[in-house]
Amino acid sequence: MRFDPPLEEGRLLRRYKRFLADIETTTGELLTIHCPNTGSMLNCMVEGGQVWFSRSNDPKRKLPGTWEISETPQGRLACVNTGRANGLVEEALRAGLISELNGFTGLKREVPYGQENSRIDFRLDYPDGPAYVEVKSVTLGFDGTPVAAFPDAVTQRGAKHLRELASLAREGVRAVQLYCVNLSGIDAVRPAQEIDPGYAAALREARAAGVEVLAYGVCLTAEQVFIDRRLEVLLGD
């Protein structure tokens, strides 16, 4: 996935009201841009840190700029636009890069399912039945270690999705939790027990129920981002 038009550079001044960020561009322009991330962005939100943003020409948009990438204190790049994750996964699925999910004959996005009024990110159809795939975007890293963690804030919605997947798996339906790790320099991912122990417990319960837990990393630059490798999942059990 190429960033088109090309991203512009700046430095972060502040993030506020969750969805807003003030930046200064390399030309000295002061802008308020959209922050497309509802998490805490623990290691992605350093005042004065380098950021990259896209700019839309849509006259209907109140804020033409969207925050796309941050440089972390450890010098990694993080794609903070969580809306990119599903597009990256679909691109990789169609290219056959997620080997565990190859062979599908149909792909649908945002399909209603479950008992708690959920929508699954992807339903993949196979000759022997469907697979339901939930995608989470991961950007949290600690102290320069090559292990990312999810979530970066308490997520009741994320735990709900795991319950829904576990219910499917118990009924004999293929259910998959896929972590798209949008952080460079990562080899593995784990649940962030110290941030949301409820989510970590729900993930372990989901896997015990038969949910497949996969993680894939990306190649990320200021020009493009794409899924390029499978990562290890560390559940601590």
UniProtKB/Swiss-Prot annotation:
GO MF term set: DNA binding
InterPro entries found in the cross-reference section: SfsA (IPR005224), SfsA_C (IPR040452), SfsA_N (IPR041465)
One Pfam entry name: SfsA
Coiled coil: none
Disulfide cysteine pairs (residue numbers): none
NCBIfam families found in the cross-reference section: sfsA
Family: Belongs to the SfsA family.
PANTHER family: SUGAR FERMENTATION STIMULATION PROTEIN A
Name of the protein: Sugar fermentation stimulation protein homolog
Lineage, uppermost ranks: Bacteria, Pseudomonadati, Pseudomonadota, Gammaproteobacteria, Pseudomonadales
